[in-house]
């Protein structure tokens, strides 16, 4: 699969949806946004408990642990699902808000779930939604589907004091909202690019990175102390959050604009140097230095459209291949397992998948099958990262985001 130029217009028209305007596939009826004050609402407790999320070990030689639980963001519903990772036991769903997308779990066991209605807070030990923080950004009526407004990517500061959520504004540029995790208040709103699929944080917490799909860019933000916020200049480094720079990430160029498939989706932050790794089409891996805005492009081998990323504790990069843009030239869905030295293994997957999370011991990848376009399924594929063997775990409702709980 070679892309010296963009694919022919006919192919783009037939398949355009990865980044274009809303289409008929998003047939879910819109919902009316609930009225209420600009403060978090709460939900009634749910019975049941699960293990608290803990820091990951540093290597992949850790002895086998007790079975984990997966926390799935059910993009096709208004729930998160607790799914036993060993395939035993019954899934447990908790209502969080319409069309949840991204999920991040802190060391205190609280999960932060980006929904169309607000940033939901779930106690993973009691399995209850304890709050939902409304966005300050106006996103229109609450809806479902690929282009719905509301939260997408979400991440936590290393000290757990702030949550960062990328908010999509249909037909416009998005925002990054900063939430104080103690007071459950939005403390700053900053402008970012269109459709902020992914939010990542530097290992030391000194920078936040927002990958905006529709505008081919990464916004680099100095989170400061998490209060207020500005578009450029001033504050930062302990003051108000500010935008440091915007970096175009387009190894194939930006021709085609919203109709192009060749956009960034998700990034992974390499702990050794803080660089962002952004995969494209199973051919090119952009290695971006966010401190300078400079990047290098490295070769990949899966030859398929790519979305979700994750890093294992020992530094292997996992990349989800959703399937071909052009079936005549491209390969099918897959999981790329890329070693720190750049060598790759490609594990075929059954049908499109969206995102991935690794087990803390680095032995297993959990890949969600709730793709944002057609072809999605209700479940997760577990991949043994040593043997490449796969195992299907049914559960969730069009799950997109995933976190591993112990």
Locate the predicted segments by residue.
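N-terminal export leaders
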Residues: 1-7, 15-18, 25-27
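Predominantly soluble domains enriched in secretory-pathway, periplasmic, or organellar proteins
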Residues: 18-406
């Amino acid at each position: 699969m070679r892309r010296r130029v963009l694919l022919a217009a006919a192919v783009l028209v037939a398949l355009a949806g990865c980044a274009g305007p809303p289409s008929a596939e998003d047939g879910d009826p819109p919902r009316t946004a609930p009225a209420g004050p600009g403060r978090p609402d709460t939900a009634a407790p749910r019975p049941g408990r699960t293990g608290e999320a803990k820091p990951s070990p540093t290597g992949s030689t850790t002895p086998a642990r007790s079975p984990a639980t997966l926390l799935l963001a059910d993009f096709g519903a208004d729930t998160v699902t607790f799914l036993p990772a060993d395939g035993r036991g019954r899934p447990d769903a908790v209502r969080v808000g319409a069309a949840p997308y991204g999920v991040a779990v802190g060391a205190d066991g609280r999960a932060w779930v980006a929904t169309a209605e607000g940033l939901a807070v779930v106690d993973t030990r009691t399995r209850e939604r304890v709050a939902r923080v409304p966005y300050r950004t106006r996103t229109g009526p609450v809806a479902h589907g690929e282009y719905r407004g509301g939260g997408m990517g979400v991440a936590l500061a290393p000290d757990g004091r702030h949550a960062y959520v990328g908010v999509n504004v249909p037909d416009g540029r998005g925002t990054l909202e900063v939430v104080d995790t103690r007071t459950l208040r939005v403390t700053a709103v900053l402008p970012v690019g269109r459709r902020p699929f992914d939010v990542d944080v530097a290992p030391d917490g000194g920078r936040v990175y927002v990958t905006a799909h529709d505008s081919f860019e990464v916004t680099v933000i100095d989170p400061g102390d998490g209060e207020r916020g500005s578009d450029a200049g001033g504050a930062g480094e302990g003051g108000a959050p500010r935008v440091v720079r915007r970096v175009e990430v387009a190894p194939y160029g930006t021709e085609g604009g919203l109709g192009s498939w060749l956009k960034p989706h998700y990034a992974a932050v390499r702990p050794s140097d803080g660089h962002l790794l952004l995969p494209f089409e199973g051919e090119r891996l952009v290695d971006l230095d966010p401190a300078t805005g400079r990047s290098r492009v490295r070769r990949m081998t899966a030859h398929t459209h790519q979305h979700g990323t994750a890093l294992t504790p020992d530094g292997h990069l996992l990349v989800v291949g959703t399937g071909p843009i052009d079936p005549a030239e491209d390969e099918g869905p897959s999981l790329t397992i890329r070693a720190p030295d750049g060598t790759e293994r490609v594990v075929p997957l059954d049908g499109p998948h969206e995102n991935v999370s690794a087990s803390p011991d680095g032995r297993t990848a959990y890949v969600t099958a709730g793709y944002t376009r057609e072809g999605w399924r209700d479940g997760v594929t577990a991949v043994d990262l040593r043997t490449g063997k796969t195992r299907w775990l049914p559960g969730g409702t069009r799950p997109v985001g995933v976190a591993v709980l112990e």
